[in-house]
């Protein structure tokens, strides 16, 4: 097992790419902590993982609130004694065409708070715990849009994801001496609730191929596609990889004009 005896916090772990990573990590021997705001959904997913032989706990937390992030870290340490892996996956997108002169300030603040501030806070409070145990892996789930602007995405979303990419680089150089590796995943169009596709619909090929014109592979990615990328960064297979970005986008970035 590639993550045997490891402990991972996955923010936004109750749905989409976070759930995909949680299920894969658990199958590889990792104890996973699903962090999120929706208690009933999170506890249901954690129960599903346990029923399939994995170790999973849901902890309710809003990653944009410092005190709740501190509590998330403290509860994880109390339950498992350590944190080896952090997957900063929680994210929102208001799905509006928001140029700087158009986007609502309240919506802007909300997206930045969850996507970027949330990743910053989790990193801030996890790093000391990783230093104590001699290292760890931090994975930031950004976007193919962290380095390319489009007319169809909001200013806040682009800035939040671009900021996550730079958070990876800053954290990488700051903590490499402590054997903490930090990497970014850049997903393209993945079939998640953010894309209005529920987990139960993932086996429906008509739905998955509904956005076939978006990317060269002519289908949307599955949450497991991002989960396996996260598994690589979480495992010792990437022990010499830090400060890196991995595109999981079906070729989308190659065709963005």
Q: Which functions belong to the PLM regions below?
A:
Residues 14-16, 38:
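Conserved glycine-rich cofactor-binding loop
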Residues 39, 61-72, 105, 224-225:
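The beta1-alpha1 cofactor-binding region of Rossmann-like NAD(H)/NADP(H)-dependent oxidoreductases
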Residues 92, 139-163, 168-177, 189-190:
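Catalytic loop of short-chain dehydrogenase/reductase
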Residues 93, 97, 230-231, 242-257:
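Short C-terminal tail/terminal secondary-structure segment
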Residues 96-100, 104-112, 211:
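Substrate-binding pocket helix/loop in short-chain dehydrogenase/reductase
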Residues 128, 173-177, 239:
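Alpha-helical segment proximal to the catalytic Tyr-Lys
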Residues 184, 206-237, 241, 248-250:
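C-terminal helical subdomain
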């Amino acid at each position: 097992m590639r993550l045997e005896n490891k402990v991972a916090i996955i923010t936004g772990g109750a749905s989409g790419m976070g759930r995909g990573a949680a299920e894969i990590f658990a199958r590889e021997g990792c104890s996973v902590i699903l962090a999120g705001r929706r208690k009933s959904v999170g506890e249901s997913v954690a129960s599903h993982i346990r029923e399939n032989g994995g170790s999973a706990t849901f902890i309710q937390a809003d990653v944009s609130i410092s005190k709740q992030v501190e509590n998330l870290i403290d509860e994880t340490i109390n339950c498992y004694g350590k944190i080896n892996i952090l997957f900063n996956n929680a994210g929102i997108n208001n799905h509006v065409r928001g140029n700087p002169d158009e986007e609502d300030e309240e919506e802007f603040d909300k997206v930045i708070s969850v996507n970027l501030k949330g990743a910053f806070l989790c990193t801030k409070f996890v790093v000391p715990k990783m230093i104590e145990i001699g290292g760890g892996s931090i994975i930031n789930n950004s976007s193919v849009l962290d380095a390319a602007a489009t007319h169809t995405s909001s200013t806040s979303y682009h800035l939040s994801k671009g900021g996550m990419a730079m958070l990876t680089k800053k954290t990488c150089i700051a903590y490499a001496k402590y054997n903490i590796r930090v990497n970014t995943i850049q997903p393209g169009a993945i079939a998640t609730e953010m894309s209005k596709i529920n987990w139960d619909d993932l086996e429906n090929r008509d739905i998955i191929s509904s956005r076939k014109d978006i990317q060269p592979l002519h289908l949307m990615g599955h949450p497991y596609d991002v989960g396996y990328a996260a598994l690589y960064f979480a495992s010792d297979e990437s022990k010499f990889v830090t400060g890196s970005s991995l595109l999981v986008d079906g070729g989308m970035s190659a065709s963005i004009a």
